[in-house]
Amino acid sequence: MDNDFEQDPEQSASPRKPRKGIYILPNLFTLAALFGGFYAIVMAMNGRFDMATIGVFCAMVLDSLDGRVARMTNTQSAFGEQMDSLADMVSFGAAPALIAYEWALKGLGRWGWIAAFVYCACAALRLARFNVNTAVVDKRYFQGLPSPAAAALVTGFIWIMTEAEVTGPSQAWPMFAIALYAGLTMVTNVPFYSGKDVHFKKSVPFAVVVLLALAIAVINIHPPAVLFGLFMVYGLSGYVLYAWRKFKGQPASMISTSTDEPDERGLHQ
């Protein structure tokens, strides 16, 4: 007999613990994302800020794929989770801070390295909080600005300025403000939509495919400006959502106090 007792429904709905072991495919994507961050740091040290920013954006694309690859191939593991966090710290924490400092913040003296450190420290705090709150946060939203989006704000500004041939020292204070905004927003409780409730395996109307094609075409018009604009909108959207929830009298926190309610089941996996 396979089972001597009937499994409790709440047990079956609880998330499975990540398996122990190391799987090649998802960790290859994670290592590639880590290389993107490392490459960005090297390029910044050599004054190639355009290539440094592209390295961070490439790391963002690869970082968005490793988790999906692991789920699709059923190769999630505790090792992969830890590896992903460490790679994110390099690519979206240390790399953007160093790029911003080398490009513009260096000219502000102590204020420059303080802004760079605040961003880097907030990225570390954001990633640590994400790891410990995974089971209690509504998966439809991020608690605070996600580190890849924060990195996109910092490096996207540098990318668009270098494309326009604007020198870093002339943009020191705007860079200071963006670094602080991105860093501090990472550690707030402001909700940002995660998109994790979108099911890619379900069929979609043909119009959605057309819109995706148009979006790709628009991005290719001028990638630095379009991408920076999109992430600026996203970086402000959390505060709009927070204000709207407050106005409607809804809880603004993404941490649930109960997982027993029917509308909350499955939202914390």
What are these regions (language model features)?
Residues M1-S14, K139-Q269:
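C-terminal membrane-associated helical module and adjoining short loops/tails
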Residues M1-S64, L241, P251, L267-Q269:
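Topogenic membrane-insertion module of multi-pass membrane proteins
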Residues P18-F29, G36-F49, I54, A104-T134, ...:
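"…together with the soluble PPM/PP2C metallo-phosphatase catalytic core" -> "…together
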Residues R19-N27, F79-A87, R140-Q143, S194-V204:
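Short, amphipathic, aromatic/basic-enriched membrane-interface segments that mark the entry/exit
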Residues I22-T30, M72-L127, G156-W159:
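Multi-pass membrane catalytic core of lipid/isoprenoid biosynthesis enzymes
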Residues N27-L34, L86-G93, A149, K201-L212:
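Short hydrophobic alpha-helical membrane-embedded segments
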Residues Y39-I54, A94-I114, G156-P174, N220-A225:
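Helix-coil boundary and interhelical linker segments in multi-pass alpha-helical membrane proteins
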Residues S64-M72, A124-N131, T188-N189, Y239-P251:
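Juxtamembrane membrane-interface segments at transmembrane alpha-helix termini
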